[in-house]
Amino acid sequence: MMSAAQTLASRLKALQCHFTWDLDLRRSLLLRCRDNLLDISTDNGNRWLGHIYNLRGFIQYKLGSNEDAQRFFNKATDAFNKMRNADEGPWLVVNYGNLAWLHHHLGDQAESEAYLSKVDALNEKYPSPSQEELHPEIYAEKAYTLMTFNGDMNLVADYFQRAIEMQPDMVWNSWHVLALTYASKYSSTGLDDDIFQKMRIVQEQDPENLNLAAHYLCQRAQKGESIEDEARELATKVLGSPVGSYSGLKPLLWVYRKYISDDEAIDLAEEALKNHPDERYLKRRAALCYQKRVLRRNSPSTKSMLDRAVSLHQEVILLYPDSSLKKKLHLAWIYAQSHDGQAKAEQIYQELFKSYLEPEDKQMLYNYYAQYLYFQKQDHKMSLQYHMEAAKIQHQSFFRKNSIKVLEKIRDKGRHRMCGEIRTFLANLPEP
């Protein structure tokens, strides 16, 4: 017979909540997710507000702040109830599960038991429409959580699909389509026709969703449609909406950079900043626009543009102190564009090499430094060495793929003096 403690432990493990889901809990990712969640507008019309607070509570717990965790879990409860205009419902199952786990870790087993009982009562009163499936509210929250953690987008889309099949919901429909879009992110021709048509239908059903509208514009542009006028019309709407990462500004700026011009993208980002000069999210978006413009080789940057790019990156690094590695790498690359900035670029790289980085972040650093050595220092041998260091790290990412691609190109040409070493290296390189 199991003891009371064993029974409690088994009941906790059986819960559907953030504490039991298989999430990537690297500290650097937790910090990035926390900052990304802070950049989402928390106005009362945000249907994800309860989910956002739930996730922020879990992240704060994993980062060591139990008090903040409880505060956010309680805010999630309130947000769910206000949004649904009800004191209880299946949307609270994950939230109560989180609170059961938190009180268990705090040593308050009676309170943990109380929340377990609440979960049991909700599951009994609001069973899933399908005995073989989780409740659609749970699938939707699980999908949203994985999406925030940059998880498997195909799995995210599957969870949303399961939720929608049991409980049609316009917001879930929109996010299902976005998940399908993210899953096809690296396709040069855009979405498959069936997903594209689904996106068109959902966008017509959810016309106020500017984030979805901007992504739809991206896909239409990739299909060869002329979208300049619509992009400018959408920009007016985005500028008038609450500031946040769901406003549609990020994908819209991508459309501007790709299909209109880098300079107009900068103008749009600067206009947004003029309206809200203290918003760190807008500074982050503007910094990226300047970085892309500075790196455009066919049109040299003016000193004033370089100065603005540097100052924005410096601000963003200060505003995101725990999740600014990529911005530091971008700043180093911007410095490297001018002769006077070479020493500053090298200083940033060397400081990063001395800092503690998780393997995945170290991989990104090696890849960036390899490109810096090749393009700015013309040190091709050392550049290849750093590409090999990036490829060695057993983490599948864009940066690993890029480094391997560079090495394969050298191997296939067969003319570089390191060709034999690279051929042996690639032949013995294990897959993650």
Go through the PLM ranges and name each one:
Residues T20-L37, K62-N81, G107-E124, F149-A157, ...:
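Helix-turn-helix repeat elements of alpha-solenoid scaffolds
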Residues K13, W48-L55, K62, W91, ...:
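"A position-specific structural signal for the A-helix of alpha-solenoid helical repeats
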